[in-house]
Amino acid sequence: MALTAAYGGAKWSERSTVFRDDLPGTWGDWGVSSECGTLRAVLLRRPGEELDGVIDFDAAQMRADVLPEVARQQHDALAEAYRAHGVSVSYVERTRADKPNTLFIRDLMLMTPEGAIVTRPASTVRAGEERFVAEALACLGVPILMTVHGGGTFEGADVCWVDQDL
């Protein structure tokens, strides 16, 4: 009996493209390979109620005390500046009340030319924040290439794109 197409038979059609070639038609225009190129889209977390209950900013591993209302005003001004320059602004809407650092999105993901790497912060204070970034990326349709797992730790702010071919 001849194989059906589903099992490699005569009507089987093998992909001849690489993932990067599939991006525009399948996933959309996602990907970053530069720290200084034109910014088209950004993922942010507006400082929320998770900042209101912080009493000890050092224990929260923040470098200085934060005034939540001032942080919100500054965030809103930044988001508006992005929009005024044609940048699409998306948000991580959810987090937990005990995760005030979630607003530092750059730590929680790294965009590559082919999609996102969801990181795994080294600090127990930050543990679990990456889930909310992964949810937001999935809702936006951004391909998630990898999630740092096992005993690995990594933060997106630890990387700087120098050359897309490196």
Describe the role of every protein-language-model region.
Residues M1-L166:
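The feature marks the mature, well-folded catalytic cores of soluble enzymes
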